[in-house]
Amino acid sequence: MKIFFAILLILAVCSMAIWTVNGTPFAIKCATDADCSRKCPGNPPCRNGFCACT
């Protein structure tokens, strides 16, 4: 049973790392570029009301 939970934990950590590298898995609304710099890594621009985190 411990091995099963260890595998689940590894999968969760890896999926979170992939989301961090590729950007957020969901759209983040913004009004200005400053909103995105607080919510996304790498200071992405605000396009059409959403942050370009990818």
From Swiss-Prot:
InterPro entries: Scorpion_toxin-like_sf (IPR036574). The keyword Nucleotide-binding does not apply. Belongs to the short scorpion toxin superfamily. Potassium channel inhibitor family. Alpha-KTx 14 subfamily. This is Potassium channel toxin alpha-KTx 14.2. Residues 1-23 form the signal peptide. It comes from Olivierus martensii. It is found in: Secreted. Inhibits potassium channels. May be active towards small conductance calcium-activated potassium channels (KCNN, SK), and less active towards voltage-gated potassium channels (Kv/KCN). One of its GO terms (cellular component) is extracellular region. Disulfide bonds join 30-46, 36-51, 40-53. The keyword Disulfide bond applies. Expressed by the venom gland. One of its GO terms (molecular function) is toxin activity. It comes from the Eukaryota.
